[in-house]
Amino acid sequence: MTKTIPKIGSRKKVRIGLRRNARFSLRKSARRITKGVIHVQASFNNTIITVTDPQGRVVFWSSAGTCGFKSSRKASPYAGQRTAVDAIRTVGLQRAEVMVKGAGSGRDAALRAIAKSGVRLSCIRDVTPMPHNGCRPPKKRRL
């Protein structure tokens, strides 16, 4: 009879002291800047907020999904508000410009949250891309 050779690395690993659905933050801590640009991209499905320095280098970004919202709740105004608060608190901005893109429901809520956070806003720009009769839009959905 042959002896069975014990496996060195088994597939089952025992994790001590961990909850089953524990989430861990793998992000590095964001750089602290005093002046920057806040980009708000509000689509119909999500709200993404990116904070950059004046040269355009990304310092921190946040979205409704990374704040813990799932599926259709990512498109809500409350998700946009929480995303904006999360991004500004992490970076610690004092003065900023705001660039708003898109027509989603989180757009106005994110803008209100940025204004109430105590950041001095130098300008608010709407940079939503508007065609000057360029490409033909996709056909309308029929439900």
UniProtKB/Swiss-Prot annotation:
Could you name the domain of life of the organism this protein comes from? Eukaryota
Q: In which compartments does the protein localize? A: Plastid, Chloroplast
Cite the InterPro entries for this sequence.
Ribosomal_uS11 (IPR001971), Ribosomal_uS11_CS (IPR018102), Ribosomal_uS11_sf (IPR036967)
User: GO annotations under biological process?
Assistant: translation
Q: What are the GO cellular component annotations?
A: chloroplast; ribonucleoprotein complex; ribosome
Q: What UniProt keywords are attached to this protein's entry?
A: Chloroplast, Plastid, Ribonucleoprotein, Ribosomal protein, RNA-binding, rRNA-binding
Assembly, per entry: Part of the 30S ribosomal subunit.
Protein's name in the database = Small ribosomal subunit protein uS11c
Lineage, highest ranks first:
Eukaryota, Viridiplantae, Streptophyta, Embryophyta, Tracheophyta
Gene it is expressed from: rps11
